[in-house]
């Protein structure tokens, strides 16, 4: 690949880098820890890869070198499930007395905060 019988010549490398710059090409090594590529049916994970990005006239090309590990992709995504929290009378009284609001307002704030006392009190305090 390199002239001179395949021996690496640092001076030749500098000349090649200068020529690349003259043609609008720039290369940079990235300090990547992990690279993940998601395919239709599997996921490729590169641990401790060598990643280089080349910029050629505004178009970036990424080169990843390393050993890839295949990981099976999950079949289905878990759907978000809305959970209704049961608000106790004690919680309603606590929020009502702390914020100086009616029990109805306190109960509504607790329901909106999914039963979180601190969040309900902060919401009513503002």
From Swiss-Prot:
Superkingdom to which the source organism belongs: Archaea
Pfam family, one: UBA_HYPK
Keyword Transmembrane helix carried by entry: no
Entry-linked SUPFAM superfamilies: UBA-like
PROSITE patterns named among the record's database cross-references: NAC_AB (PS51151)
A GO MF term: RNA binding
Domain NAC-A/B span(s) in chain numbering: 10-77
InterPro entries associated with the record: NAC-like_UBA, NAC_A/B_dom_sf, NAC_arc, Nas_poly-pep-assoc_cplx_dom, UBA-like_sf
Any GO BP: protein transport
Key words, A-Z: Protein transport, RNA-binding, Transport
UniProt xrefs under HAMAP family: NAC_arch
Quaternary structure and partners: Homodimer. Interacts with the ribosome. Binds ribosomal RNA.
Function: Contacts the emerging nascent chain on the ribosome.
Family, as annotated: Belongs to the NAC-alpha family.
The protein's name: Nascent polypeptide-associated complex protein
Gene name in the database record: nac
